[in-house]
Design a protein with these regions (language model features):
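Hydrophobic h-region of N-terminal signal peptides that target proteins for export
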Residues: 9-20
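Bacterial N-terminal signal peptides that target proteins for export
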Residues: 1-10
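Scaffold/interface architecture of coatomer-like assemblies
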Residues: 19-313
Length: 313
C-alpha cells in the first residue's frame, strides 16, 4: 500500500447523512441540513454531556437558526490516524504507538480506522478496518527517517477519509513532533483549512514540540491550531511524552460524547460563500462549546440529503 497517496486527487462530492446499515437512521424525508458535532466543557475542561437543547443557540452569519435535530449519541466514526514517522520521532514512537492503540481500544467498537505513517511522503499502511491485529501491525511499522511532510499527509488523509469512510462522522488524529519540512507548496495552510472545512472532518492534533526550536515550534502550532479550531477539534501540546497516552484517551472519550446539532439555514442559497457558524451554550461551570467555525454553502458544505426530520428514540 506504500505510495498509495501519491497523486491522489479525489473530488469532494456531496456527502450523505443516511446512516449506515448497522446504525439507527438519524434523519428521513427531504431537506437540507447543516450538521454540527459539538463538544462542551466547563472551566476546568471537563466534558458536559447532559445539557438540554434549550441551553444551546446556533447562529449563521449572525442570524439565529432554528435547531431541527439535537441529541447526544455515541455514533460510529471513521477515524484516520496520521502519525509522524520522521527521523526525529525514533525515540518517541513506542509511547506514540501505545497511545494510538489505546485510543482505538477506547473507541466505539463499530468505528473503522485507517493508519497513515508519514515522513517525506505519506504511506497508507492500514486501510479502513476494525481488526485490532492489523492496526497493531500498522502502528508498529517503524521506519523513522527523513523529513516531515505534514500538510501533504493531512491533505491526502482527508481525501482518503472522504472517499472511503463509511461513517457519517469523520475524524483525523494527527501526531507530530515538528514543523513541516517536506510538503510541496500546492497545499498551503490556507488551502488546507478550506479543505478541512469543506470536508467536515474533525481534526485533533498532538504536537510533541517541547524539544523543537521555538521558531519552528511556533510554525508547527500555527498549522495544528488552525486546522483544529476550524474543524471543531482541539490541539494538545504535552510537555512530557508520558502525557500522550492520557491525551489519546481524552480524545477517544470526547469523540464518543459529542452533541449532534442540525439546522436548516434561513439563507437557502447554495452560492458557494463561506457561512460563519457560532454556537453558544448556557449551563453550570461557565461552559464553552467547540464545533466547526463554518462551512461553504455548496451541496458538499450544507448537505443535500434524503434525511430531514430526526428519528428520535
Amino acid at each position: 500500500l506504500r505510495g498509495f497517496f501519491k497523486g491522489l486527487l479525489i473530488p469532494l462530492a456531496a456527502a450523505t447523512l443516511l446512516a449506515q446499515s448497522d446504525e439507527v437512521p438519524l434523519f428521513k424525508a427531504d431537506s437540507r441540513l447543516v450538521v454540527l458535532h459539538a463538544s462542551v466543557v466547563d472551566r476546568k475542561g471537563k466534558l458536559l454531556t447532559d445539557l438540554p437543547e434549550n441551553a444551546f443557540k446556533v447562529y449563521e452569519n449572525g442570524a439565529e437558526q432554528n435547531i431541527k435535530v439535537f441529541r447526544r449519541e455515541d455514533v460510529p466514526v471513521s477515524i484516520g490516524m496520521v502519525i509522524d514517522n520522521s527521523g526525529s520521532m525514533r525515540d518517541k514512537r513506542a509511547k506514540v504507538e501505545r497511545a494510538s492503540l489505546d485510543l482505538v481500544k477506547a473507541s466505539n467498537p463499530q468505528d473503522e480506522v485507517f493508519i497513515v505513517n508519514f515522513n517525506d511522503e505519506a504511506y497508507l499502511d492500514v486501510e479502513f478496518t476494525n481488526d485490532m491485529r492489523l492496526l497493531e501491525q500498522g502502528i508498529a511499522r517503524i521506519d523513522s527517517r527523513g523529513g516531515t511532510a505534514l500538510r501533504d499527509s493531512i491533505s491526502m488523509s482527508i481525501d482518503y477519509l472522504k472517499e472511503k469512510g463509511k461513517k457519517d462522522k469523520k475524524v483525523l488524529l494527527v501526531i507530530t513532533d515538528g514543523n513541516d519540512t517536506a510538503s510541496n507548496d500546492r497545499d498551503t495552510l490556507e488551502k488546507l483549512v478550506d479543505k478541512a472545512q469543506k470536508s467536515e472532518v474533525l481534526i485533533f492534533a498532538v504536537g510533541l514540540l517541547s524539544e523543537e526550536e521555538p521558531h519552528e515550534a511556533k510554525k508547527a502550532k500555527r498549522v495544528l491550531n488552525s486546522l483544529a479550531t476550524a474543524s471543531g477539534g482541539l490541539a494538545y501540546y504535552p510537555k512530557e511524552l508520558a502525557e500522550v497516552d492520557e491525551i489519546a484517551l481524552r480524545v477517544a472519550h470526547e469523540i464518543r460524547n459529542q452533541y449532534i446539532i442540525a439546522y436548516t439555514p434561513t439563507n437557502p442559497a447554495l452560492d458557494g460563500t463561506f457561512r460563519q457558524i457560532h454556537v453558544t451554550v448556557k449551563g453550570p461551570g461557565s461552559p464553552v462549546v467547540r464545533t466547526r467555525t463554518g462551512y461553504y454553502a455548496t451541496a458538499a458544505g450544507a448537505r443535500e440529503t434524503k434525511a430531514a426530520s430526526a428519528r428520535m428514540p
